[in-house]
Amino acid sequence: MDSPSSVSSYSSYSLSSSFPTSPVNSDFGFPSDSEREDKGAHGPRPDTVGQRGGSRPSPGPIRCRHRSKVSGNQHTPSHPKQRGSASPMAGSGAKRSRDGELETSLNTQGCTTEGDLLFAQKCKELQGFIPPLTDLLNGLKMGRFERGLSSFQQSVAMDRIQRIVGVLQKPQMGERYLGTLLQVEGMLKTWFPQIAAQKSSLGGGKHQLTKHFPSHHSDSAASSPASPMEKMDQTQLGHLALKPKQPWHLTQWPAMNLTWIHTTPICNPPLSSPGTISFSHGPLGTGTGIGVILFLQHGVQPFTHSAPTTPVPPTTASPVIPGEPMKLSGEGPRCYSLPVTLPSDWSYTLSPPSLPTLARKMTIGHREQQRSHPPVAADAHLLNL
């Protein structure tokens, strides 16, 4: 029979010979089979030494522990190598991507072509179409066009309008979308012709506006003095007064026709050959009421009058303030009728420089009174009404 030492050596040898077939060792690149046999031949020495010392440890677990330690020691340094080799590759890829992005950004910022400038200019010109487009978009969102458009058409219209507004708000998009922007420009001018007309008029006639600007100020300044008079109360403007033996002066008298109307139903004598006219208390009785009607034509220039007066009830005609100029619009002939009452000692003269003197015969009452009282001719001065 075999001795225990031979059995132990045989068992240790068999265990050592079984390790080279392990796939784990071959995966991690362990040493060759010859080296493992040499290690197995020298392996029983520690067992025999332990056996001589009286201890019988199992050689298998020792071998397994040793192999496991070696495998762990050999496996752990392999991971740092792989990690170290992978990390530089990842870092280089990130650096390359960042460098590429920087280069593209620099190229886009530095290289601006004429097309890019034209695109930006067109976007700025079409900025005026953004408010009506947004109003149209809001109307679509609120359902203002539900009767005329289907839901699909409304969604498509909203999408198109949003894209157009987005393009107009980004003038830095560049030459790439210039053709599309030109098509959008034609479409917007078709949709909103009034805005296109306003832009063309504003762009082409700025210097004309600056030239016409002072003229508008002068027109407004010329029309401003007349506006307070129109706003004033008629009662304040309608008081006209006459004082006996106080002449009325006329600076520049326009072309007009004069008609004297008596309160009693008598015939009004027409204008006759040049001469002079005078009224005294002879032909007209005391307290006789007369009316003066002035027909003013185009080209009327402002005239003034000055005389202390007594108030007379306002009339339907436009009144005049004594001592202040009055401007009449040249829209057409105007009629001014001012009824007055003549006292017994009142005299009325008519002698304007530009108005020819007229000779007239007044008929008052019955023809018998006209025969008994012949008309008297004298120089006269006309009221400036």
Curated annotation (Swiss-Prot):
GO terms for molecular function: E-box binding; RNA polymerase II cis-regulatory region sequence-specific DNA binding. The keyword Repressor applies. Residues 70-79 have a biased composition (Polar residues). The keyword Disulfide bond does not apply. One of its GO terms (biological process) is negative regulation of DNA-templated transcription. Residues 33-45 have a biased composition (Basic and acidic residues). GO terms for cellular component: nucleus; PML body. InterPro entries: Ciart. PANTHER family: CIRCADIAN-ASSOCIATED TRANSCRIPTIONAL REPRESSOR. This is Circadian-associated transcriptional repressor. It comes from Homo sapiens (Human). The gene is CIART.
